[in-house]
Amino acid sequence: GPDTLFPDVKQLQAGEYIFVEDTVNGLNIKKHKYYQYAHNYPASITEEELIAEHDEVVLNIFNRLIQIAAGRTIVVPLSGGYDSRLIVLMLKRLGYDKVIAFSYGRPGNSESVISKQVADRLGIRWEFVEYSNDLWYQWYHSDDYKRYASFADGCTSLPHIQDWPAVWRLKKDDRIPSDSIFVPGHSADLPAGSRSASVPELYNNESIDPRRVDSTILKYHYSLFDWTKRREELEPLFINKIEQTLGNDEQFPDNASAFESWDIAERQAKFIINSLRVYEFWGYDWWMPF
């Protein structure tokens, strides 16, 4: 929801805007929601039509990216996933050569192995930043990290740190141009149905069941700490917040649509997309294709 660490301070959320009017009685502030994700299903469409439509959309996206990049180097955090692989593939397809891919972690990790294989196949320059326990200790206790944590949380989100040291090293070692634009593959997997593997019980075309959606959100997204000893106290509070975020159940055709809508608003917008603060902190532009 709109809450922050400060009870009297609220945040503007994804799909919302604020209208501020200066009146004789002071400022009149109104918040409006203009968009909420809810997937629906076409009445009739063939697989061939879907593929053609998808290709048209993707071509439009990456032609726009090339215009925005305007000759600058595009830096792609290339993992083993399909999202980032699609980015480098489309840039290759459209003939944009100023591309650098990078990966990070322990040497030989599976993500970086696939990353290098893809970059080599496409003839793209590839950079690797090694991680280790000792290096993480140094990074985490640095003054730069303290500044980043303060910069990136917005009093509402966890600072994303996974690739923060990698971008730091790429910058400090002059391995990428100072005017580079970072293009990650964030969030493309969600509308493609990635959650169907994690919570298949919701992907069965059943009509909306709010209790089932609420319990699945709690199970999937609130599992990193043990709050079972306070379940009777906390669960009603969490469920109330979840239902406030989802709004009217009738807008969703099924459980999966409601589950993904909450994920888009609360996980993607406030955590995954908040990882873009990494690039901003180190002085780089970014662009999201998906």
Functional labels for PLM-detected ranges:
Residues F19, S261-L276:
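Core structural elements
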Residues A258:
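Shared catalytic-loop signature of beta/alpha-barrel
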Residues G1-I45:
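N-terminal segments that mediate ammonia production and transfer
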Residues D22-V24, Q36-N255, S275-F290:
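ATP-dependent adenylate-handling active sites, centered on carboxylate activation for C-N bond formation
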